[in-house]
């Protein structure tokens, strides 16, 4: 018989750095999820990823207190800031430029994010990422 789903929880956890301290511990604990079990499973699953990169994770927890989780790729903004060597985007996008990024880098980001984006092809994914770049105050060149 199938397990009864009690709910879902979305978190953004640094790769390889899940620990029971806030905000992860309280978010899991109040839903009755075994915190240490999640931390061990997540850290093992995110070993191959770049240490410290923010990983969106969707946790489905069941009434019997068990859980499953699905890891996504890091957010587009993380990739854009990394590609443009920025700490943060522009405070006034459209007026002040935070930096530039080439179309080649946009294509690389689109290919990395393709499985998580709702895009038919790489060109559509590139347009989405260029929109995110403009929202951050980045200029797409090339």
Swiss-Prot record:
Tagged with keyword RNA-binding: yes
Oxidoreductase found in the keyword field: no
A Gene Ontology biological process term: translation
Protein name: Large ribosomal subunit protein uL11
Listed InterPro entries: Ribosomal_uL11, Ribosomal_uL11_bac-typ, Ribosomal_uL11_C, Ribosomal_uL11_C_sf, Ribosomal_uL11_CS, Ribosomal_uL11_N, Ribosomal_uL11_N_sf
UniProt keyword annotations, A-Z: Methylation, Ribonucleoprotein, Ribosomal protein, RNA-binding, rRNA-binding
Transmembrane segments: none
Post-translational modifications reported in the UniProt record: One or more lysine residues are methylated.
């Amino acid at each position: 018989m199938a397990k009864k789903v009690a709910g879902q929880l979305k978190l953004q956890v640094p790769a390889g750095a899940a620990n029971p301290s806030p905000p992860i511990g309280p978010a899991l604990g109040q839903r009755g999820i075994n915190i240490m079990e999640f931390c061990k499973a997540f850290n093992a699953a995110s070993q191959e990823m770049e240490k410290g990169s923010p990983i969106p994770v969707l946790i489905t927890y069941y009434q019997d207190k068990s859980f499953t989780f699905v890891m996504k790729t890091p957010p587009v903004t993380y990739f854009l800031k990394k590609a443009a060597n920025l700490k943060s985007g522009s405070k006034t996008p459209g007026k002040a430029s935070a930096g530039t990024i080439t179309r080649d880098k946009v294509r690389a980001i689109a290919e990395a994010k393709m499985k998580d984006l709702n895009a038919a092809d790489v060109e559509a994914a590139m347009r989405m990422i260029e929109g995110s770049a403009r929202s951050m105050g980045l200029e797409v060149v090339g």
